């Protein structure tokens, strides 16, 4: 059994030597990196690295380049899964790694093209600078400014979109409220107009008008001119007739009580003109010698908005035309 190490307490064999393992790169790895990341073909790479000195310089930079590519991949994966208080640090580290990788790619391309002459000490100093995983203060400040600017732009865009949505919803609510309030207002105007008209005239629903034989059979009509201050309506009032003793008698009539009757014409002849001040129409006295009889069912009158029953087979005074 060998002796025990005083640091790690692991047994080790006597005369055992340990070597530090290094990430060894070969020419195949260099060609893969230059074709995949720099966009060069294999034939171009073979010609570019024909110079042995340039090939050695590229091989010295390649391990550092691959190490930072691996770190960048880890930062990309941790960006979405890390804790909230670590997001700013991960974002800063990602920007820093991208800056380092871009710088190394530029140096590698210039060395391969032969436009960049660097000594071995400069290559080692460059590798040490990037290997310490540190950047200058200006690089860190640039990364932080980029993060802050992105945060401000995102906040401004979100605020603008939110204000536009709130304004659109407010306009829609105002339009809907205007539509809902429009119908009652129109109804109120119609009701007010109806109330105004209802006070202008009234019609006695118990009065009976009998039309004599002089009206032609097949069409019975009474033309009533209704006028008031607001409108003029020409209403043609017709009904089904009943043939009694060779005459035509109106069996039903529609009388508009919400309008003032100014002139009544029966069979194109003016029979009477009621006084506009009177609220009821009174028929003139006529002899009761005509045998015509009014046969009336239900007469619907708009005055008062109710239907009244008129006795059937009621005899009344006849106005001969």
Swiss-Prot record:
Protein name: Tegument protein UL51 homolog
Positions where lipid (S-palmitoyl cysteine) attaches: 8
Assembly mode: Oligomerizes. Interacts with UL7 homolog; this interaction mediates UL7 homolog incorporation to virions.
Compartment annotation: Virion tegument; Host cytoplasm; Host Golgi apparatus
Keyword Phosphoprotein applies: yes
InterPro entries attached to this UniProt entry: Herpes_U44 (IPR007619)
Superkingdom of the organism of origin: Viruses
Post-translational modification: Phosphorylated.
Native source organism of the sequence: Elephantid herpesvirus 1 (isolate Asian elephant/Berlin/Kiba/1998) (EIHV-1)
Record key words, sorted: Host cytoplasm, Host Golgi apparatus, Lipoprotein, Palmitate, Phosphoprotein, Virion, Virion tegument
């Amino acid at each position: 059994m060998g002796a025990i190490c005083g640091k790690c307490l692991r047994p080790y064999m006597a005369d055992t030597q340990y070597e530090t393992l290094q990430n060894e790169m070969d020419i195949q790895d260099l060609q893969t990196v230059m074709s995949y990341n720099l966009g060069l073909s294999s034939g171009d790479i073979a010609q570019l690295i024909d110079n042995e000195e340039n090939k050695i310089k590229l091989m010295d930079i390649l391990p550092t380049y691959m190490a930072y590519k691996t770190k960048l991949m880890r930062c990309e994966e941790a960006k979405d899964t890390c804790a909230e208080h670590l997001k700013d640090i991960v974002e800063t580290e990602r920007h820093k790694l991208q800056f380092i990788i871009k710088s190394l790619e530029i140096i590698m391309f210039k060395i391969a093209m032969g436009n960049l002459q660097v000594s071995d000490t400069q290559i080692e100093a460059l590798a040490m600078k990037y290997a310490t995983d540190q950047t200058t203060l200006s690089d860190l400040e640039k990364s932080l400014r980029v993060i802050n600017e992105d945060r401000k732009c995102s906040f401004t865009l979100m605020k603008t979109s939110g204000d536009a949505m709130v304004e659109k919803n407010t306009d829609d609510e105002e339009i809907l409220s205007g539509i809902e309030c429009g119908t009652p207002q129109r109804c109120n105007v119609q009701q007010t107009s109806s109330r105004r008209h209802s006070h202008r005239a009234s019609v006695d629903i118990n009065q009976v008008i009998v039309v004599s034989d002089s009206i032609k059979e097949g069409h019975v009509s009474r033309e009533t001119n209704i006028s008031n201050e607001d409108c003029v309506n020409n209403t043609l009032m017709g009904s089904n007739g009943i043939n009694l003793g060779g005459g035509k008698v109106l069996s039903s009539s529609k009388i508009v009580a919400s309008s003032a009757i100014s002139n009544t014409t029966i069979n194109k002849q003016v029979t009477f003109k009621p006084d506009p001040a009177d609220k009821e129409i009174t028929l003139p006295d006529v002899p009761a010698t005509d045998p015509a009889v009014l046969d009336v069912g239900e007469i619907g009158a708009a005055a008062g908005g109710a239907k009244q029953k008129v006795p059937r087979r009621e005899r009344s005074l006849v106005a001969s035309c």
